[in-house]
Structures are given as structure tokens and as C-alpha cells.
């Protein structure tokens, strides 16, 4: 070991002078190289590798150090716990592997061989972060190693100076200021449709996984506490704290140890650190279970509840943000604390205009105040009405009382009474809102209980049972074991609250699934198939029938559950696959088709009496000698289908007043009926004075536009906005045209609209018209599917639909000579050009000259029952004529409805 005495002073001075000169020469060479190649960058010796957008280029005078590796390679084992690591990275301390062909390739641990002074010593492999070389502490260096140590310091200073000049040249990743990780926020709403049953199953599964993980962690903690060895204590003391990126909501918490540990132990430590870290401990309030107001762009302040990331099934929220479950729809969002307010700020956050306009907002307010009143112990007595149809008013009254209580400051307990109980602060606890009964759908279920002690009511425990357990799978298993009757369960969702039989298959159906079936049974996508499953009116993956004349779909979940495991995969492999409605067999596992399903389906829609009304007034037939010509008021007349049918039936028409705004429709009516129609323009401009002047009327007919009512339209505005409001114009003029009291002359009316409308809109229309609709599908009397609702007081509207000899029931009967139909019936023809295409493969319905072809306009007119060339006026294009037909009525259906009028009015 060389001495460090005074005798070596002169030699040391000479060596330092040589080192200084050598360093200056290298610095000049480096400056020349940088001026010649400004894009080349020097790589630091001993710096742990990290990913960059541009790979660094090593300079010629920089020795290759075996300790310099990529991010995935371990650091030198000599590095102590004080060495800096890239933020959020976990580097295992193990022996580095030298590169093949390097001078140190044969040395263990990368140590340089004797006599090789150009190699970087192990001390040079210390961690360098942000341009600073961090030296080790607690290690003594002998005087004999002074030269190597000084040389290393000089090299580090050179590299530091070079980095100072090139700051930012390597991109954001190499500069002092790091580019923040993008924050991924989850706004309200899911990227795809998720049924309520599927979401509940996911929540239950996440809960079970969370509880299982918590048990494993508890066992691991108990085992670690029993192992009180000194080595484990050293490991725990030497472990640096876990670091988490504050800008990344999904960055995991990692734990590091100074020495390599076994794989199992590493997994234990990582799992424990990730799961045991408390949530929302940033000192900014809003803990788990608290009721809050949250603000998202485009929405009013919306009530929600702070929940754990476990419940969302996604990643942890970043510091300063919270996971919020919104009341009303039960969806999740990450919201920063600056956009949150406590529920006690009800006066400033509650928005009365949104409450009056949006049913979902009313539902959310109801649910959050139910929870708040339960926590505060505030009792709001439920209103009990003898008529179940008035339960919507009871809900409104109760909601109004709760809002007044909230606006008054949640007295007497105040904001203190809104704090969550201890059991709701558990991050693994799932929260479910009380059942909401919409005012327009209140007759479907009784109003919810007002406070917790009333859990003995019949409705709430059943809802809890459906939510908390995979009831459908369990009940189907019991049916297979002959322990339960399938008619006693809802085969659509698994509910035990069966109110009627499923119209297509053996099994029951609950009220909620009935509402879904009424909305979705006749809702079709652009490919002509049903939008949702025939059984459950849901499903994300559906199997489409291969029969060209069938348009039904079945979801994979229902098929595997009711038919048998693996049945869906077998159906996918079968090509073409005939569904369970058009297959030859009637029984497929537990799925048994009803033999009388056509009549049951018709009665399902015809007897859909959610509201009971007085039967319409029945007029006795008028003696033949006293019959007079009919006077008609036609609103939204279209192409005068009503007048055409009356003429076909031979009924004399005295006056036909029509309200229409489409110029093409008016042209068709004027030309085809020789000016016998009196057009009066926009329906909104017709007043009561006009009705008295043009009347009296014997028949009022109309069908308002369905664009904003059909649930097929994702941008629909409903009954009270857009074109949906035109229904109230029909109601207004119908009221003005009714005979006055004491006038017993026969008076009839008819209103038509689409079947695929929301249940609430249908109920509102029925409430105003004081009549329940009948559903009639034109496929029974024509070559096209066209299901429509009809409200009215025409005699015999509920009678079976029967075709006549002149009705063209097959598409082939409607085609011109030389053209072959590929389908027996076509899907509903709308104003859109692609509605002509049929099937999942979007085939044209006609085959001509060995090619597929569309329907000609004359053929579409035959499909609707119009005379040939009925719309061929004023050089209208094919698409314009299709738009007129797509908005019109089916002539055979209107003939079926108008036929009884021959007993009341004069005929030719």
C-alpha cells in the first residue's frame, strides 16, 4: 500500500500538472468536435440509462463503462441507498454484466484489470441525476488512489459543463424540468353501452377481489410481524420511501430495497405498499363516503359520492383528485378537488332550471337527499295514495319537501349530520342508491322508503337482492335442478318480481324488463337487425339470425345461460345460423318458444294498459238514409294517404282540410287529387277561429314527426323539445274540433307515431289523449315491416289484422317483370337511402341481370300500397320520392282502421 507521507509531494505535483494539461487538451478537442458535429451529444459516465426520444451518441474520448446500461438493467452493487434513482423507477441492486468484447468482459462485476488505466473505476458508476454527480459518503479513499479519483472528478466536471451547454438539446426527458405525465380523466359516461345487470356483476366481482386481496394482505402482515429477525429489520430500515408521480393518476406505488431479495418477497412488498397506502390523504378533504357537488364541463353542479378506486375498477386517482360516483346514473369520474363542493353548499349548487328540465337531474337530487336524510335522521313521511297511478305525485311532493329541507341548511343537525358513518368510509364497501321512481313512470313501482328503519317494505329488499347477488345465474341453476319453476323468475334479468309472462319464450318478465321490451322490440339498427337481444333487450355482443326474413338478435350471455354453456360459440361456427325464433325445434335447453307467440306479442302491445282510462264513447251505426259525406281535418298530412284510403273505401268526402309544410308532399296531393284538398300551411298557424270557420269535422287524423321521439335517434330531444312538441298542436286542434256538449253526432280521431319511443313519452301521449295505443305492424298486410302505435276512438281498432286478396304480402309481388326478390319482406323503409339494404351483409333486395339492385320507386309504392307512379310528379328524384314514402302511412293498415267508418258516413 503506497505511503502518503511528505516524500511523495513533488511527484504528486507533477502528476497533477500533467493531468491538468491533459484535461485542457481533451477539452479543446471536445470543443472542436462539438463545433463540427453540433447534433452529437456526450453520454455521461456512470449515469444510469433512461429512455430518451433520441439515442445519445458516445464521443470518441469517452470510455465505455460496463455499468452504463438501459433502464431495465440493474445498477452497480456498490451503489448505496443515497444514490438517486429516476423518479418512480425501481432498480434492483445486482452485479452488472459487461458488454461482450469490452476490456472488462472477463472481470467479475465489471472491475478493470490491472494496468488498464483507461477503464473507469467502479466509483465512477455512481448515479448521476439532472447533471449533478452524487458522491458516496462513509467510504475512505487511500492516497494511492488519489490519481484515479481526481481523474474521475475532472471527467465529471467536463461532462457537467458539456451538459450545461446542451441543456434541453436531448428533449424534455434530459432537461432539468421534466415533462409532466398526461393525466387521464374519466368523464361521465361509458365508451359503450353497459347494461345495469352487467355493471352490477362487475361491481360484485371487484368487491370479492378486493376482499380477497385484503385477507391476503392481513395474513402477510401477520406472518411478517412474527418474523422478528434482525436481517428483516435492517431491510426495513434501509428501504427508501416510495415515490409516486403526483401528475400521473395511474402511477403505481413502488418499494425499493438496498439489496436483492427473492421474487416472492418483492411481490409481497409491492402488493403491501400498493394496497395499504391510504387514499385521499393529501390533506384537502373529501374522503370516502362524503356527499359532494361536482362540476364537469357541459353539466350543472351534479351531486355525487366520493368512492374508492377499488369500486371503479380502474386506477388510483392522482393527488388532488377524487373518484366520484354520480347520483342518477351511477357512473364514475375523476374530479379535481377545486371542482368539488360539500353537499351542504346546496343553496349555491342546486340549479332549479335543470331540475325542471332534466329527469336525470331530478333523479340524482332525489337519491342524494335520500342518503342525506338517512344520515341526518330526518324523517319525510311517504304519501300513500289509493290510486297507484298517482304515486308519481307522491314522489314529487316528497322530493319537494327534501329540497326545502336542504335549502334550509339540513336542520337541525346541519352539515355535521351529513358526514358518512364509519362503515361507509370502508374503501371496499359498495354503495347503492335508493330506488328512484320517475314521476312519469311512477306506476311501475311504489315510492321508495323514506328512511333506513323502513327496510321491511316489500320493494327495497328485492332490489337489494338483485343487486347484491348474481341472482339470474343462481335461479337458472335452480331451474335446471328442478328446484324452481322458470315461470316464477324473469328470464331477462333474474328478478323475482314477475308481473307477466314473456311473450316469446316460456318464462316470466318483470315490470322493468317489460318497459325495456316495449321500447326496444321494434328498434332496428342500420343493418336491419334488432338493436338489442330478443330475450333481455340488452347485451353487448349479439348473434344475428342468418335467415334473411328474420331480423332478431340474441346476446351471448342469454344464449350460454339459457341454452347451455358453449351454445354461443356453436352458433357462431354455424353458418347460416337460424335463431331460436325461426328454427325448426321449439326447445333449446331452457329456452322454449311459445307456440302462440304471434298472438301473445300482439296482445303484449295491445293490452299495455299502464294507465287505465274510461273507454271511448261508442257511437251507434247511422242508418243508411241519414248518412252524410265525411268532413276531415288532416294534420301533418304528408302525401294524402287518408284521402286516398277514404276514396278506396268508397266513402264520400265533403271537405278535406290538410296542414302540411313539405312542398313535394303538397305537390303530390294537389296533382293526384285534382285540387280537392284545401292546404292551410303550418299547423301552428291554425287557430280555434279557423276550426270553427272550416268545421264542423267528423274525423281528425294526424301523425307528428317522430325524429325527436324515436329512441333510434341518439340526438332525440323528446316530447317537449324540437319536433316532439308538435304533438301538442295535434292535441290542441283535436280539443277545438270536438263536438260541444249535447252534440251526439259521431266524431272520430286517429293519431299515429313510432313504436320505438321512450316509455315516458308514450305515457305522456296516452295521458293527454286519454287513450292507450294499439300496435299494428304492416308486415301482416304488406311486404314490409312497419310497426306503429295508433291512438284513437275508431271502432274495432283492436280487432285482428286480416289481409285481403289485393294485398301484396310478398316482395316478389311488388317487383317489375324480370326482377327477382331475394327476400320475402323488406325491413322498414325510412327516409334514409341505406334503409333499402337488407340483412347483416347489407344486400340489395332485388336480383336483376345477375346483379343486385335496389328497389325502384314504383316497387316501393307497391310495397306501401300506393298506386304505381303515385309520387311521380314534378320530376322528383328517386331519393326525394323515397323520403315522401318513408314518412307516409301504410295504405293497407289505414284501410283496416278506416273500414268501420262505412257504417257512419255516406258511400258512393
Curated annotation (Swiss-Prot):
A zinc finger (PHD-type) spans 530-586. Residues 1-183, 226-281, 443-462 are annotated as: Disordered. Residues 69-80, 242-256 have a biased composition (Polar residues). S-adenosyl-L-methionine binds at residues 637-641, 660, 682-684, 887-889. Auto-methylated at Cys-706: auto-methylation takes place in absence of DNA substrate and inactivates the DNA methyltransferase activity. Inactivation by auto-methylation may be used to inactivate unused DNA methyltransferases in the cell. Residues 490-582 are annotated as: Interaction with the PRC2/EED-EZH2 complex. Changing residue 326 to R: The protein is stably expressed. Changing residue 710 to A: No effect on activity. Changing residue 832 to A: Reduces DNA-binding capacity. No effect on activity. PROSITE patterns: ADD, C5_MTASE_1, PWWP, SAM_MT_C5. SMART domains: PWWP (SM00293). GO terms for biological process: autosome genomic imprinting; cellular response to amino acid stimulus; cellular response to bisphenol A; cellular response to ethanol; cellular response to hypoxia; DNA methylation-dependent constitutive heterochromatin formation; epigenetic programming of gene expression; genomic imprinting. Keywords: Chromatin regulator, Chromosome, Cytoplasm, DNA-binding, Isopeptide bond, Metal-binding, Methylation, Methyltransferase, Nucleus, Phosphoprotein, Repressor, S-adenosyl-L-methionine, Transcription, Transcription regulation, Transferase, Ubl conjugation, Zinc, Zinc-finger. Belongs to the class I-like SAM-binding methyltransferase superfamily. C5-methyltransferase family. The PWWP domain is essential for targeting to pericentric heterochromatin. It specifically recognizes and binds trimethylated 'Lys-36' of histone H3 (H3K36me3). This is DNA (cytosine-5)-methyltransferase 3A. It comes from Mus musculus (Mouse). The gene is Dnmt3a.
Amino acid at each position: 500500500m503506497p505511503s502518503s507521507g511528505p516524500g511523495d509531494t513533488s511527484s504528486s505535483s507533477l502528476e497533477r500538472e500533467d493531468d491538468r494539461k491533459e484535461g485542457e487538451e481533451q477539452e479543446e478537442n471536445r470543443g472542436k468536435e462539438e463545433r463540427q458535429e453540433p447534433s452529437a451529444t456526450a453520454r455521461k459516465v456512470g449515469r444510469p440509462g433512461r429512455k430518451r426520444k433520441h439515442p445519445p451518441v458516445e464521443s470518441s474520448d469517452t470510455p465505455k463503462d460496463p455499468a452504463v446500461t438501459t433502464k431495465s438493467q440493474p445498477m452497480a452493487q456498490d451503489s448505496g441507498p443515497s444514490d438517486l434513482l429516476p423518479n418512480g423507477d425501481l432498480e434492483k441492486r445486482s452485479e452488472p454484466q459487461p458488454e461482450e468484447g469490452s476490456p472488462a468482459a472477463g472481470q467479475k462485476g465489471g472491475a478493470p484489470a490491472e494496468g488498464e488505466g483507461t477503464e473507469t473505476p467502479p466509483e465512477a458508476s455512481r448515479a448521476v441525476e439532472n447533471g449533478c454527480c452524487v458522491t458516496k459518503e462513509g467510504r475512505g479513499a487511500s492516497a494511492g488512489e488519489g490519481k484515479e479519483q481526481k481523474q474521475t472528478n475532472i471527467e465529471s466536471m467536463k461532462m457537467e459543463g458539456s451538459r450545461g451547454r446542451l441543456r434541453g438539446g436531448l428533449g424534455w426527458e434530459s432537461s432539468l424540468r421534466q415533462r409532466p405525465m398526461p393525466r387521464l380523466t374519466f368523464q361521465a359516461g361509458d365508451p359503450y353501452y353497459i347494461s345495469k345487470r352487467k355493471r352490477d356483476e362487475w361491481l360484485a366481482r371487484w368487491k370479492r377481489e378486493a376482499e380477497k386481496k385484503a385477507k391476503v394482505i392481513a395474513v402477510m402482515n401477520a406472518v411478517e410481524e412474527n418474523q422478528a429477525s434482525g436481517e428483516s429489520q435492517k431491510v426495513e430500515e434501509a428501504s427508501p420511501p416510495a415515490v409516486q408521480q403526483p401528475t400521473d393518476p395511474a402511477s403505481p406505488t413502488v418499494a425499493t430495497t438496498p439489496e436483492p431479495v427473492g421474487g416472492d418477497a418483492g411481490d409481497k412488498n409491492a402488493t403491501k405498499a400498493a394496497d395499504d397506502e391510504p387514499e385521499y390523504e393529501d390533506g384537502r378533504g373529501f374522503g370516502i363516503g362524503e356527499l359532494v357537488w361536482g362540476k364537469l364541463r357541459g353539466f350543472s353542479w351534479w351531486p355525487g359520492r366520493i368512492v374508492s378506486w377499488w369500486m371503479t375498477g380502474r386506477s388510483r386517482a392522482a393527488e388532488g383528485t377524487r373518484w366520484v360516483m354520480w347520483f342518477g346514473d351511477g357512473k364514475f369520474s375523476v374530479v379535481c378537488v377545486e371542482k368539488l363542493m360539500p353537499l351542504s353548499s346546496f343553496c349555491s349548487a342546486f340549479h332549479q332550471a335543470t331540475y325542471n328540465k332534466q329527469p336525470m337531474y331530478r333523479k340524482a337530487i332525489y337519491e342524494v337527499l335520500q342518503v342525506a336524510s338517512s344520515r341526518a335522521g330526518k324523517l319525510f313521511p311517504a304519501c300513500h295514495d289509493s290510486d297507484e297511478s298517482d304515486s308519481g305525485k307522491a314522489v314529487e311532493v316528497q322530493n319537494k319537501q327534501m329540497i326545502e329541507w336542504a335549502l334550509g341548511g339540513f336542520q337541525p343537525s346541519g352539515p355535521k349530520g351529513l358526514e358518512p358513518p364509519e362503515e361507509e368510509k370502508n374503501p371496499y364497501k359498495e354503495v347503492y342508491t335508493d330506488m328512484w321512481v320517475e314521476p312519469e313512470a311512477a306506476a311501475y313501482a311504489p315510492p321508495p322508503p323514506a328512511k333506513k328503519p323502513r327496510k321491511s317494505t316489500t320493494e327495497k329488499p328485492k332490489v337489494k337482492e338483485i343487486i347484491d347477488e348474481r341472482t339470474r345465474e343462481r335461479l337458472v341453476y335452480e331451474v335446471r335442478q328442478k328446484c324452481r319453476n322458470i315461470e316464477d323468475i324473469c328470464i331477462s334479468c333474474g328478478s323475482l318480481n314477475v308481473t307477466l309472462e314473456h311473450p316469446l319464450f316460456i318464462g316470466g318478465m318483470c315490470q322493468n324488463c317489460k318497459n325495456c321490451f316495449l321500447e326496444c322490440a321494434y328498434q332496428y339498427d342500420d343493418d336491419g337487425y334488432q338493436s338489442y337481444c330478443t330475450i333481455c333487450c340488452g347485451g353487448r355482443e349479439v348473434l344475428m339470425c342468418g335467415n334473411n326474413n328474420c331480423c332478431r338478435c340474441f346476446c351471448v350471455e342469454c344464449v350460454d345461460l339459457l341454452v347451455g354453456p358453449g351454445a354461443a360459440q356453436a352458433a357462431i361456427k354455424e353458418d347460416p345460423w337460424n335463431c331460436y325464433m325461426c328454427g325448426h325445434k321449439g326447445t333449446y335447453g331452457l329456452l322454449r318458444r311459445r307456440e302462440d307467440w304471434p298472438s301473445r306479442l300482439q296482445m303484449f302491445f295491445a293490452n299495455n294498459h299502464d294507465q287505465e282510462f274510461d273507454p271511448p264513447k261508442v257511437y251507434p251505426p247511422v242508418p243508411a238514409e241519414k248518412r252524410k259525406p265525411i268532413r276531415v281535418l288532416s294534420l301533418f298530412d304528408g302525401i294524402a294517404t287518408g284521402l286516398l284510403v277514404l276514396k278506396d273505401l268508397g266513402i264520400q268526402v265533403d271537405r278535406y282540410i290538410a296542414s302540411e309544410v313539405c312542398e313535394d308532399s303538397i305537390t303530390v296531393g294537389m296533382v293526384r287529387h285534382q285540387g280537392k284538398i284545401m292546404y292551410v300551411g303550418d299547423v301552428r298557424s291554425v287557430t280555434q277561429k279557423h276550426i270553427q270557420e272550416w268545421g264542423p269535422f267528423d274525423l281528425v287524423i294526424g301523425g307528428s314527426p317522430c325524429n325527436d321521439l324515436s329512441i333510434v335517434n341518439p340526438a332525440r330531444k323528446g316530447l317537449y323539445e324540437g319536433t316532439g312538441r308538435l304533438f301538442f298542436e295535434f292535441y290542441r286542434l283535436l280539443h277545438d274540433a270536438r263536438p260541444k256538449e249535447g252534440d251526439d253526432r259521431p266524431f272520430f280521431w286517429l293519431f299515429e307515431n313510432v313504436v320505438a319511443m321512450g316509455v315516458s313519452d308514450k305515457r305522456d301521449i296516452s295521458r293527454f289523449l286519454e287513450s292507450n295505443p294499439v300496435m299494428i305492424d304492416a308486415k301482416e298486410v304488406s311486404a314490409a315491416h312497419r310497426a306503429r302505435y295508433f291512438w284513437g276512438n275508431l271502432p274495432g281498432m283492436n280487432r285482428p289484422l286480416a289481409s285481403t286478396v289485393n294485398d301484396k304480402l310478398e316482395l316478389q309481388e311488388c317487383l317489375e317483370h324480370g326482377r327477382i326478390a331475394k327476400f320475402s319482406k323488406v325491413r322498414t323503409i325510412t327516409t334514409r337511402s341505406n334503409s333499402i339494404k337488407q340483412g347483416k351483409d347489407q344486400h340489395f333486395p332485388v336480383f336483376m341481370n345477375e346483379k343486385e339492385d335496389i328497389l325502384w320507386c314504383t316497387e316501393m309504392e307497391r310495397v306501401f300500397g300506393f298506386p304505381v307512379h303515385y309520387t311521380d310528379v314534378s320530376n322528383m328524384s328517386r331519393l326525394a320520392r323515397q323520403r315522401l314514402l318513408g314518412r307516409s302511412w301504410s295504405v293497407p293498415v289505414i284501410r283496416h282502421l278506416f273500414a268501420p267508418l262505412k257504417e257512419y258516413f255516406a258511400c258512393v
